[in-house]
Each structure stands twice: as structure tokens, then as C-alpha cells.
Amino acid sequence: MDISLDRLWDEALGHLQVQLSRPTFEAWIKTARAESLVDNRLTISTPSEWARGWLQKHYASTITEVVQRVAGIPLQVEFSVAPQALVEEEAPSTAVASTSRKAGSFPASAPLGLEVSGSLPMRAPDLNPKYSFSRFVVGPNNRMAHAAALAVADKPGRAYNPLFLCGGVGLGKTHLMQAIGHYQLEANPRAKVFYVSTERFTNDLIDAIRRDSMQSFREHYRDVDILLVDDIQFIEGKEYTQEEFFHTFNTLHESGKQIVLAADRSPHLIPRLQERLCSRFSMGLIAEIQPPDIETRMAILKKKAEYEGMILPPEVIEYIATTYTSNIRELEGALIRAVAYVSISGLPMSVETIQPILNPPSEPKEITPDMIIDVVCEEFGVDRESLLGSSRKRDISQARQIAMFLMRHHTNLSLPKIGDYFGGKDHTTVLYSCEKVSQLQRENLQFERQLQNLAQRLRVMANSRNR
């Protein structure tokens, strides 16, 4: 076999990254290491016995198939435990986290296993103060959801459990969820209310697995009175996240604790959702929120203006409500733009004044790979041929990595397709480039702002070219 152990595992990781879901890869595969290759027997080390058992049970055949394909010969795969590798790798960040974490916080990046004064940190409700029942406008589109949320807030764990709120983007699901939390905390300040997005739940789970601190993770999520989980549709296809959430759900439900979930669709329309989870999500009440009608949209604008101290003529309210029909977020955004424009320009508030700046909302335009190449070349002063070529000069190499990162995040191209765009580079090279840019983005605020600026330029370019 004419391939080194490191190269074999690096190429295998690239294939597994493409085949498996991102949380699965991050939690189980990325933390493993190729330990040795002797007599066609590949030993893969894992950071804990838990991880070794899970890989052996669920991914042994997949990993074996991939490494054999990369090596070109039959291989036997074995799994071992080598926790010291992970401890050494994570030690610097763990030390920083232990000294800098504030009481009352639970960041996704902080080690779950660390304790403060002998116990896990208090969880902050993380609720938006504006999302209260008093600021929620009730209409025919959301009356049932509002009534159900009030019932749950008044008698958590007894009215509807779980309460599943579903509807499109910007229709008030998050507002109602957090209003439940505010209501309960006002009635009982000692209540343990926890609002979390599904992405945060998944990230915390991955972090716990990597640090072998699942017990702390479970205590954190299961020792609550009300659990509010937003965007639960993003649990689709995440097998281990679904497994863990299933047991979290059962523990809370059996203890009479309230669970409120929100998604952009009903449970049975979420693809690759375990049947048992779909059944549990549906066992309480599913309350759908529809787009608001014209009267409700006008009422929303009036209430928003009232809270913000704005004075709006009736015809302006009607114009905005007629122009923006799909969701509340766009509606309120249009109102803010109109008020800001009038304030800055000094013009009177009228339909004629705001009409030019409130064009009807349009679908976001597509960002193409060629646009990304153009913007990156201009930003870094390199030519297209060099960027797409194989030059190893530092400035060109960095610009190329940024272009790959932008393609991954702003187009639908797969890693292999991005590699093809850059002269047939292997998808592992693309993955490495994207991870390197992500790391620099986290560590360097100026670099993060540069990436944000590039993304904004791409959106402007896409809108101008696709008109």
C-alpha cells in the first residue's frame, strides 16, 4: 500500500465529511485519530469509551468501507480509547474557559464538565424583553396559538404538553414561546425556564461528547421547569441529536415539566425525523400560525408605533400593511426604515415620501461562484488565473482559501464541486481551507469584519446583476 497513515486518514476524513451529517462528523469522526496501521489492521483511537462504543456500533462499517476505498486494499478496522490526545489538544482552551466564564452563563463553547462552586452554572433564560403577551397582536391567523400559549403559561405541564407552534418565518412563534417564559418568571421568579435553539442544543451536545461530560449536559437540559426549543426542524437527519433529545423529552414529560417547540412546519412534514419523536411532538397540541391578514398587519404596525413613540398617518400604516404581506418581521422592518428615512431627510411622513424606499420585497438573488471569484480578486489584488491555479504564494493561497470558504457558505456547491472549480483540488483540501478560514474568523475580529464586508458586496452584486 503506497500511502502513509496520515494521508490515509486525512483522505478518509474528507469522504466521511461528505457522507455524514455535519453534527455526526463533528461529534464522532473528527475527534477520532488514526493510531496505527499494522498488517492491514487500522487502529482508530477515540477520546472516551463512550465514543469508542458508539463508533463501533453505528459507524464501523461506514468507516471500514471508506478507508478500504482510499487505501485500495482490504483493511480491518479496530477502535481503541486514547483520551490523553483530546485532553492535550483541548487543555489551553479549557484553561481559558475555566477562568473567564461568568456565573450565570452557559456558552456553547464552554466545557460542560467544569463546575463553579461545586455545581453547574445557573442558566440565564435568554429571553427578549420585548417578547411579552402584552406586545403580541392577536388576529384570526394566530388566535388559537395565542390562547394555547396563555394556557401553557398559566398552567405549565398541565394544559398542552408539548405545545408545538408551527408556521413560516417571522410570524411570531419565537415571540409566543418567549412570552410563555416571561409570564411564568413573573408569576414564579424561581422557575427554571430555559430557551434554546436547536442549533445551540446540538452544539452543546457535540461539546459534551468531545469532553466526555454527557452527565453534566443531561443535568443542564433536564433540570428545568419549562424547556422552550426553537427551530426544532433543524433536528432532521441528526441521528444522535434526535436520540439525546428523545430521552430529554421523555425525562421532562414524565416529570410533568412543560415543553414548548417551534418549527416552520408540523412534525409529520419534518424529513428524516424519527417516528417516535414525531409521535411525541404530536401528542400535545399543534398550533399553526398563518400569515396575518390586512387588519392584523395594520394592528401590528399601530402597536409597534405606539411602543416606539412614533406618530403615523393612517394612510401610511395602510400602505405599509398592503405592501408587506408575508411576515411580521418584514412588516416591522419596513416601518423602521420609513421612520428612519423621514427623521434623517426632514421630510413629512406620507405615502409619497416613503414610497421610493419601500419597494415591495423580492426574493434574494443567487450568488454565483464567478461573482465570488470577481470579488475576492478585487479585494486581494490577485488575478483570476492565479487564484484558480496552484500558486503557493501566501497572499494568493489565503485569497484562494477565502474564496473556497465563501463558495461553501453562499452557494449550493458540494466540497468536490468547489474543488473542481479550483483546478480539480481534492475535497479534503477545500475542507481544510474552510476550517482554517473559520478558525481565523473566530480569532480575529478585523478578519471577521472583512468577511462580512465581502458577503455584503456579493449580495449587492447579485441583486444588481439579476434585476
Curated annotation (Swiss-Prot):
Q: For ATP, which residues are the binding ones? A: G170, G172, K173, T174
Database matches in SUPFAM superfamilies: P-loop containing nucleoside triphosphate hydrolases, TrpR-like
Pfam families reported for this sequence: Bac_DnaA, Bac_DnaA_C, DnaA_N
Please list where the region (Domain III, AAA+ region) is annotated.
126-342
Region (Domain I, interacts with DnaA modulators): which ranges? Answer: 1-85
Per its UniProt record, what SMART domains does this chain match? AAA (SM00382), Bac_DnaA_C (SM00760)
Where it sits in the cell: the answer is: Cytoplasm
What does the entry note on its domains?
Answer: Domain I is involved in oligomerization and binding regulators, domain II is flexibile and of varying length in different bacteria, domain III forms the AAA+ region, while domain IV binds dsDNA.
Role this protein plays: Plays an essential role in the initiation and regulation of chromosomal replication. ATP-DnaA binds to the origin of replication (oriC) to initiate formation of the DNA replication initiation complex once per cell cycle. Binds the DnaA box (a 9 base pair repeat at the origin) and separates the double-stranded (ds)DNA. Forms a right-handed helical filament on oriC DNA; dsDNA binds to the exterior of the filament while single-stranded (ss)DNA is stabiized in the filament's interior.
**Entry's NCBIfam families?**
DnaA
Write down what this protein is called: Chromosomal replication initiator protein DnaA
Q: What organism, scientifically named, is this protein from?
A: Synechococcus sp. (strain JA-3-3Ab) (Cyanobacteria bacterium Yellowstone A-Prime)
